[in-house]
Amino acid sequence: MSVKIRLKRMGSKKRPFYRIVVADSRAPRDGRFITSVGTYNPLTTPKEVKFDEDAVMEWLQKGAQPSDTVRNMLQAAGVMKKYHEAKYAKK
């Protein structure tokens, strides 16, 4: 089972709101998911991104692959740098 960290669209027509979820890669975009790890609101200024950093790190260490958009959000927040340092730290 390939697991992805991606956006699930919510909200109403023309007023999108997204949840950052961990889901099976075969599941539909707005379908079943394993767990929700954050939210993204593109309508606010500046755009509002909230997520549970510990949960995201845990899923990345388990092998979950972030989508391109989520990867950019995690890089902006510094999570990908922490993950990379933890993964390749000298033991």
From Swiss-Prot:
In the UniProt record, the signal sequence range is none
Q: Name one GO molecular function term.
A: structural constituent of ribosome
UniProt KW rRNA-binding keyword: no
Cellular component, GO, one term: small ribosomal subunit
**Keywords in alphabetical order:** Ribonucleoprotein, Ribosomal protein
Question: Which Gene Ontology BP terms does the record give?
Answer: translation
Which InterPro entries does its entry note?
Ribosomal_bS16, Ribosomal_bS16_dom_sf
Pfam families per the UniProt record, alphabetical? Ribosomal_S16
Recorded superkingdom: Bacteria
Q: Which family does it belong to?
A: Belongs to the bacterial ribosomal protein bS16 family.
Stored PANTHER family: 30S RIBOSOMAL PROTEIN S16 (PTHR12919), SMALL RIBOSOMAL SUBUNIT PROTEIN BS16M (PTHR12919:SF20)
The entry's protein name is Small ribosomal subunit protein bS16
Q: State the organism named in the record.
A: Limosilactobacillus reuteri (strain DSM 20016) (Lactobacillus reuteri)
